[in-house]
């Protein structure tokens, strides 16, 4: 934040520099990347009357295609999973679906989703940022890691797209039981007092209070060409890496790697060959193949443009 910097882990947790040192000791080469997070605002300090409501999808879309109000997953349905993981015993389980929201969930209790809101920066926002760029660690040289190409900080947006008079901002509730509002599209590392000025130039946020300031993060990652297609490290047998440590950015990217690393770790324990998806079989196959065969110089995201077999990878096929 500004000229202040300190080591740390996830929010409120200590740093894990010892883990990085251990990975280096076994022969893994590490690099540095950067990311950022926006400020969190107090919900009741925002004037929502001045901004646009963006409601969630109704009905709520689920990852499953099963639409029945109630369904059961029997052992026959799970047979392929048992084979995949190498289980040699029956895995009995029962799953229930419901009408609208998960039983006993927050959504079930309050009976509806909480909407997001769309607002915009103003000319005053850009003026405050330009006047304080010299305080940003991203521009003063304190941070050297490469950031995510498609999630620029608000400083980068103002500098790189100087012709734009405004930038879209999403105000997203952190949850139903908190007053925190996540200001999506407003990542910054400017000093706190500057952040207060910046936030109050956003439409609807003229009197907003910051509960948690924005900050930039520089973190270690393992160059993923040191991994096998199974996501096992080449230098240390039985060690599998998945997610941001492999130089990726994004929830789906991390989830896909975690799925494959978990499957292959379980299969290794059971003495089975690894599962490796090809580029013509799945986007996970494209993702992992790119990681282990190409040089990663910036946080990696998966796109349809990266898949030469994109027409046969469509979800509608």
Residues of each region from the PLM?
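Glycine-rich phosphate/pyrophosphate-binding beta-alpha loops
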Residues: 244-252, 308-311
